[in-house]
Amino acid sequence: MAKVIGIDLGTTNSCLAISENGQTKVIENAEGARTTPSVIAYLDGGEILVGAPAKRQAVTNAKNTIYAAKRLIGHKFEDKEVQRDIESMPFEIIKANNGDAWVKAQGKELSPPQISAEVLRKMKEAAEAYLGEKVTEAVITVPAYFNDSQRQATKDAGRIAGLDVKRIINEPTAAALAFGMDKGDNKDRKVAVYDLGGGTFDISIIEIANLDGDKQFEVLATNGDTFLGGEDFDQRLIDHIIAEFKKEQGIDLKQDVMALQRLKEAAEKAKIELSSGQQTEINLPYITMDATGPKHLAMKITRAKFESLVEDLIARSIEPCRTALKDAGLSTSDIDDVILVGGQSRMPKVQEAVRDFFGKEPRKDVNPDEAVAVGAAIQGEVLSGGRSDVLLLDVTPLSLGIETMGGVMTKLIQKNTTIPTKASQVFSTAEDNQSAVTIHVLQGERERASANKSLGQFNLGDIAPAPRGMPQIEVTFDIDANGILHVSAKDKGTGKAANITIQGSSGLSEEEIERMVKDAEANAEEDKKLTELVASRNQAEALIHSVKKSLADYGDKLDAAEKEKIEAALKEAEEAVKGDDKAAIDAKTEALGAASQKLGEMVYAQAQAEAQAGESEQANASAKKDDDVVDADFEEVKDDKK
């Protein structure tokens, strides 16, 4: 059986692991290190350096040394995040013919998957050297909040590197897998995986359950930010140093590519030192020069100063934690373990923020740099058939439902529901004798149907003639383990059914998902007003329907003036319902109710008369029976007399 390796393709560093016979090992690279810097250098003559060798020569070859390519993967050049990075990157980011963000090095235009493939190729070679055999299959991890194009671009990078990517799995899930399989106990636990890496942030709430010796990893909720990570922390420090140097020397180091590369190295080193010390010194002699001669940079940075520079970045990571917990239906007290993943999670202030939010100390027995690769390797062994004691369950990221009366979306499956899943709900017709219904399938979080993503629609016909609200149409949503959605509708009266199969992930990018959720929050007030308007409209239509029916049955018993008054109120109410003025609809509904009061009294009186007539018949029948009844005495027997 071919070995399936696990690769954590990180923004700053990457890691490789293999799992055999239930034992997982992190494999060292050619330099003997357990992690590899995700840095690629393009030299004159076509030579390519990857990892530490590329990082070492970066200062003298800044324009052709690429780092953090993962931040560009699957992105368009015009994306605001890319535009923000252009200012701070020493290498050139360009717009490709298809609108994607690419990089120019040594005169060549390179795509991010092409650049990332160099790191993957180095991982592949290290695995082959360790195993002594050819490696062609891998599980590669991505941030949980990566969109479809980013995931596809990661798969493309694997293919360019000569790897068949068997599965793309989420980094927090992989870390939970590594943590859960490492625990010898059979305890069920809920874990929060806080993954603050070099370029991305994810939070996942995962339940680890023991099922007869097997372990099930169920993602309850996930959230994140694909442009928040250690690179942003470095940049805050770089910007501070540049501003201070400009104040002192009047020189802007932003214009000097070689100085920027030296600053990046110094900032990264200072950041790491400040995780263990209270102060560090940055010394960069001959950082630049002007007419007066060479300039040297010497600056002390305290931990407190650095923490103040990145305070808002740390705060930005806490809000998704709050959302993920809310989506999972849990409170912080329900979380058994907090796992920190990603190099940036080593920062004491980050750990303090996580501890304060979750109310417990994060675990220290998980290696933040290696856990993700280890989890990927475990999943690789599962896929190769080497082990069957692990089950991963994913979630659907957005709510699913159908359009119902009034143009609102009625949700059948809520976002963050574990898949596979199935849900059914009974609906009815909106008109008398309606012979068909259209089932319009939607995905999103908004109340207004038109504001959500339309996934498709189908018709259910041959509904037996009946008054509105009488037929029972059962709509069933069924999502399989592949995320494919099947929708069916069945008339419970006739047994007639219709269905449609929808590929839930097709045509819906993560940008759309995030936009929908954010739109839902921003437009909560508008949605509330729409819901209230629809409720008023439905109430008005129900009264209109009832009055029309009563008028048809008892109208001839009303005098002409009374009937005319009701018909006028009816017409006004029907006109109001066509508009979007809730107050007008409510007013006309009230007026119709008042105008039709006499008609209502007649309907009530008729119903009462019919009921009394029925009771009278029953009483007569009962009296006839009583003629044959003989009275008898009886004595109640107490328990103690028995």
From Swiss-Prot:
The modification Phosphothreonine is found at residue 200. Residues 608-622 have a biased composition (Low complexity). Induction: By stress conditions e.g. heat shock. The keyword Signal does not apply. Belongs to the heat shock protein 70 family. PANTHER family: HEAT SHOCK PROTEIN 70KDA. This is Chaperone protein DnaK. The lineage of its organism: Bacteria, Pseudomonadati, Pseudomonadota, Betaproteobacteria, Neisseriales.
